[in-house]
Amino acid sequence: MVGPGPTAAAAVEERQRKLQEYLAAKGKLKSQNTKPYLKSKNNCQNQPPSKSTIRPKNDVTNHVVLPVKPKRSISIKLQPRPPNTAGSQKPKLEPPKLLGKRLTSECVSSNPYSKPSSKSFQQCEAGSSTTGELSRKPVGSLNIEQLKTTKQQLTDQGNGKCIDFMNNIHVENESLDNFLKETNKENLLDILTEPERKPDPKLYTRSKPKTDSYNQTKNSLVPKQALGKSSVNSAVLKDRVNKQFVGETQSRTFPVKSQQLSRGADLARPGVKPSRTVPSHFIRTLSKVQSSKKPVVKNIKDIKVNRSQYERPNETKIRSYPVTEQRVKHTKPRTYPSLLQGEYNNRHPNIKQDQKSSQVCIPQTSCVLQKSKAISQRPNLTVGRFNSAIPSTPSIRPNGTSGNKHNNNGFQQKAQTLDSKLKKAVPQNHFLNKTAPKTQADVTTVNGTQTNPNIKKKATAEDRRKQLEEWQKSKGKTYKRPPMELKTKRKVIKEMNISFWKSIEKEEEEKKAQLELSSKINNTLTECLNLIEGGVPSNEILNILSSIPEAEKFAKFWICKAKLLASKGTFDVIGLYEEAIKNGATPIQELRKVVLNILQDSNRTTEGITSDSLVAETSITSVEELAKKMESVKSCLSPKEREQVTATPRIAKAEQHNYPGIKLQIGPIPRINGMPEVQDMKFITPVRRSSRIERAVSRYPEMLQEHDLVVASLDELLEVEETKCFIFRRNEALPVTLGFQTPES
């Protein structure tokens, strides 16, 4: 490792030399865990020996006492990446934002075990030159100095991401080892004593992205093992460790700025979920509880917060941060269970320090420890360091999206390999990591207490309802209901029903009254008939009959009158019958029977009759003659009376055959081939017709009227129809022959 070079040329030379050493060490070393939270465990536990970065990491691992999974980091593809990282680091000589990321990546790359460590180491070399260039650029005196020192430290320490550059300390591999051991011890002591101290925001912020207190406890319990594992998985975990550690250091060093900057970084990084920033002491507490749960996610968020915090003073760093955040996002799903366990163990403050230092130590051990020291000494400079450390991890995952350009190529390859491995190994952890930072950020409060956001929302909804009700009551406001129209509608409906039923009742009452009246009249007329037969004087009976209202509509009235007249002597029976029909007497058939009996009475001729003409007429008159006379009177009668009069003789004739209401229908014979003589003949078919329909048929349309000719008797048939030959056709529904002989079929 080369001593810190303030100028860009010196930084470039140191970076190149570091790159060569790192590549040589990388050939021996295997990729460390890209998951920073796993790095803290695995790297600290078992760090595969490396030329420069591995030694301080091993020392840090010894200090942290986390020997667990050194093999994962080895399995990760870090060796092929050193050249890629070197190439990526060279183009990544960019403004302070790249520098911040490079610092992080350099610190991470300092640990050859992890891919991010190699990349970060290369980035540190490139970062040194870029730091010099950035120091030249007006990014801020503090930021330029921090970047320069970070470049030097990264070049010297490899694993010292930005802590040494904050102090402008160049530490070689041995110095990194010693410094990492010391810093790990110091950080462990600081974390054990004061896990919420601001100088340790790196660790706390790292644990914070881990998100869950129980995970933090696990981290505290397994930090040494996680460090050992992280040394094995240094390549895989280095990025995450760097991200987490850098995020922790940044958040701890600048609690307020980290929150504000995290907002800016989150806004600048649409892919990255914005984490809620809280003061450093709150971040520490949250990092303790939450880092163990979901270290990767919180590391991302912390990195975002730290980037945003430090990117505001150093806008160039902010640019580099979005890349690191993206990378961190990619690395989150790649978190290893060992790293998660290590971060779970971080719940204990002492173990948190070990774990954080170890996580950073595997790829970034010395750098992170130095960063923690530098942060405790110089919080402003630690901001730059943290910014630089943060981009290293994200640069590994985004694969040169927007972080350290120098490390983009190598980190992209590493990130790809790590992404595939981590996705396979820890898909659930990635999901938890993604979700964890949100929950942690939501759980974090100003008082540093953790609460469940879901419970808060439920409580707030209920409280809001209650408050709304109370407020409405206090203001005297009530919801106005529309006027109840149903009652009025119901009333209207009831009235309508009442009127309807009343009308029906009235009709029924009227009918009942009519029936009662008709029954009374019938009873009275029946008594009169009995009196006439009993020999009561006719004058008294006539007085009674004249006193009965509407008696003319009853046939019994006319029967009584006919009997009274017959008892006195001869009278015009047919005239009486015609008058009864005009008045609409019913039932007319009873009157007809009486009239026929009077006419047929032979005793009547023996009695004294003054007029010979009347005697001859009565003796010769028959029912058919009466019918003809009634037809002559039809012109004087109303339609109803006319129908009744016309029906009288027909019914009388039908009565001869005992088939009342039957008429004759004349219809044409269908044409038959070979029988032309049949065409002159017509069918006569007996049919039954309703008198009610006959009365109303005149009002029917033509389609409903009778199409064929219908006659009441044969005499009428001869008058109407000119056809001389008729064929009687039997009606199956009416088995009546009417005296015709049915042809045998």
From Swiss-Prot:
Q: Which residues carry this modification: Phosphotyrosine?
A: 204
Keyword match Nucleotide-binding: no
Q: Which residues carry this modification: Phosphothreonine?
A: 742
What induces or represses expression of this protein, per its UniProt record? Expression is cell-cycle dependent. Undetectable in interphase and prophase, strong expression at the spindle pole throughout metaphase to telophase.
Positions of crosslink type Glycyl lysine isopeptide (Lys-Gly) (interchain with G-Cter in SUMO2) = 198
Q: Does the keyword Lyase apply?
A: no
The record's keywords, sorted A to Z, are: Cytoplasm, Cytoskeleton, Intellectual disability, Isopeptide bond, Phosphoprotein, Ubl conjugation
Substitution effect: residue 198 to R:
Abrogates sumoylation
What GO terms fall under cellular component here?
Answer: centrosome; cilium; cytosol; microtubule cytoskeleton; mitotic spindle; spindle pole
Q: PTM Phosphoserine: list the residues.
A: 745
Q: What is this protein called?
A: Cytoskeleton-associated protein 2-like
Organism per entry: Homo sapiens (Human)
Gene name of this polypeptide: CKAP2L
